[in-house]
Amino acid sequence: MSSRRETRASAQTFIENLKPLQHPNSEKVFLSGSRPDLRVGMRQIHQTDTLHAKTNGETLREQNPPIMVYDCAGAYSDPNADINVHAGLEKFRQSWIEERQDTELLKGVSSQFTQQRLADDGLDHLRFDALVKPRRAKAGRCVTQMHYARRGIITPEMEYIAIRENMAREHVPEGVLTQKSAGESFGACIGEPITAEFVRSEVARGRAIIPLNINHPEAEPMIIGRNFLVKVNANIGNSAVTSSIEEEVEKLVWSTRWGADTVMDLSTGRYIHETREWIIRNSPVPIGTVPIYQALEKVNGVAEDLNWEVFRDTLIEQAEQGVDYFTIHAGVLLRYVPMTAKRLTGIVSRGGSIMAKWCLSHHKESFLYEHFREICELCAAYDVSLSLGDGMRPGCIADANDEAQFAELETLGELVKIAWEYDVQTIIEGPGHVPMHLIKVNMEKQLEHCDEAPFYTLGPQTTDIAPGYDHFTSGIGAAQMAWYGCAMLCYVTPKEHLGLPNKEDVKQGLIAYKIAAHAADIAKGHPGAQVRDNALSKARFEFRWEDQYNLGLDPDTARAYHDESLPQESAKVAHFCSMCGPKFCSMKITQEVREYAADQEAKALLAQAPLAQANIQDVELISPDEYKARQATEADLAKAMAQKSAEFKSQGSALYHSIDSSGINDNKNDQQDASVVRVPSLEIEG
């Protein structure tokens, strides 16, 4: 069997045997809202207790609270969920949509293309098993979350988001876990608890969007805006030469496990319609598309043959399937195309290049631009959000911030205001490839021209020298852009510019971008962002290895790296790792210094006359943790450090020592040259 068939067979096995995928020592919990059917799923990471040895031989047990984190996986992380990809996820938002009484079920699909696909018996083996009738706004009604928000209505979706964004931080005990720096938010409203009213006001103002098509009731409400947690999008989708429906469903599930807040289906191969149906029905997160890709397939890949009628039918087709947001390159105008002539890499956006070719071949303005108001009317009937594509984005750092890029940005600013006339939620897409020193001006210009509509960027990549590592080169720029105010980051995988990403590439891209987004949340001063960092740092200092792994973004990889060099069970509780060994772990030394100073303080107290005559039961020996708050004297610390200095010199002044197979240092028999660092299977001349 070929590797191509093996991959597809593996994906088929995965989705047919799909069970909830839980992270180690994590629990799915639900936070309740104001109504019984408003239950917000979160992931709670349980921690072990910290054990403090007291000088009298007793052990103090300190309880470490569970840490609540944002969970994108929906039913895929719920052990009580009944998962069947052939039936799709539970339509838990259906009742919220119906109770508003502003939508109606259609007798059948409206798109001519969908009608043709349904009439083709040859597609039965690919078709989703549980197709439902589509829903649309009643005549004269608008059903967008922005429409409700502007009328002062707080929807269940808005309340759900407020609970989700707060991550139950009000229950975190004050102390070491809640300490944080003030942060620099660059004008964003960061710091106060998120309320449902705040969510409503931000959506009404256009500073945030809630991408939720009325035909995607399986999706859990989430929000994109610079005054909320930074979100991450993952791209999946088949191509004309690779991938299958099974593989794309597998990537969808995998994406939500590793933190994708939204997923874009960028399929360009055969069976785009069928693939998308499977993805939407099984997605707990909003799904985005680039409709021009499918429209191009309908005209056999000839850009010049595209027209408004084909594109409009594609929008209706996808809206009735449940696509939550469309990327539309309506800002690519005929007069902007010549501006790219002197670029090093020209027009690199697929959608942008398609529309540029159409404009030149017809010598007319883009039909996307000319029919933009009709696009808005259609989106308002299904609550499809718009993501205004940056077709003129730079494809290399040499082309960053040029005339074409910023001319299009100004046009996108004009279009977002038109969309708001129709109460259509809108975000703006951004670059691309931008060196670090040119990133901030992108955010500043976007805020200026687009009236604070949410910004959504692909990175940007900060250097072009690392094919195969562009999740690193772009993660740097993504963290910066998000700090300055970007609301959502589109991930880049190691395969960027090289090929279609597989399952492992999706994970690597998401981990890189979750790091970037989280780093930006901390830098902005988001009140709950640093709790997880503090919990992990405390676990690291206390050598609670399992808690270190489990609090991280990727517990499996962290555990595997540790166990490569110290696989023994004893190493799981050891107060050192293979980096420094038991003698020179800086955190272990610090603990010993604190314990020594605390012991000296206790002895000094006992030596005092009043205490010497007192009943010993009246004397409480404080723990290192308690002593830390009182702080040792400079003399105590100096004495302890001098003792450690003597120990270091007596052991040969070597920074590192070899570790035998049991993981225990044996310095007495170590005759190694001090200029060679030795750890298992590693030898570095130093």
Swiss-Prot record:
Q: List ligand-binding residues for substrate.
A: N235, M264, Y293, H329, S349, R350, G351, D390, G391, M392, R393, E429, Y456
InterPro entries, per database record:
ThiC (IPR037509), ThiC-associated_dom (IPR025747), ThiC/Bza_core_dom (IPR038521), ThiC/BzaA/B (IPR002817)
Q: What is its EC number?
A: 4.1.99.17
Binding positions ([4Fe-4S] cluster): C577, C580, C585
Question: Part of which pathway?
Answer: Cofactor biosynthesis; thiamine diphosphate biosynthesis
**Binding-site positions, Zn(2+):** H433, H497
Annotated region Disordered: the residues are 659-686
Free-text comment on the cofactor: Binds 1 [4Fe-4S] cluster per subunit. The cluster is coordinated with 3 cysteines and an exchangeable S-adenosyl-L-methionine.
Going by the UniProt record, its keywords in alphabetical order are: 4Fe-4S, Iron, Iron-sulfur, Lyase, Metal-binding, S-adenosyl-L-methionine, Thiamine biosynthesis, Zinc
In terms of superkingdom, the source organism counts as Bacteria
Which one GO biological process term can you cite for this protein?
thiamine diphosphate biosynthetic process
**Pfam families (UniProt xref):** ThiC-associated, ThiC_Rad_SAM
Q: What class of enzyme is it?
A: lyase
Q: Which GO terms describe its cellular component?
A: cytosol
Give the protein's cofactors.
Answer: [4Fe-4S] cluster
Alphabetized GO MF terms = 4 iron, 4 sulfur cluster binding; carbon-carbon lyase activity; zinc ion binding
Catalyses which reaction? 5-amino-1-(5-phospho-beta-D-ribosyl)imidazole + S-adenosyl-L-methionine = 4-amino-2-methyl-5-(phosphooxymethyl)pyrimidine + CO + 5'-deoxyadenosine + formate + L-methionine + 3 H(+)
Q: What does this protein do?
A: Catalyzes the synthesis of the hydroxymethylpyrimidine phosphate (HMP-P) moiety of thiamine from aminoimidazole ribotide (AIR) in a radical S-adenosyl-L-methionine (SAM)-dependent reaction.
The subunit field of the Swiss-Prot or TrEMBL record says: Homodimer.
Family membership noted in the UniProt record: Belongs to the ThiC family.
The entry's protein name is Phosphomethylpyrimidine synthase
Q: Which organism is it from?
A: Shewanella denitrificans (strain OS217 / ATCC BAA-1090 / DSM 15013)
**Gene assigned in the entry:** thiC
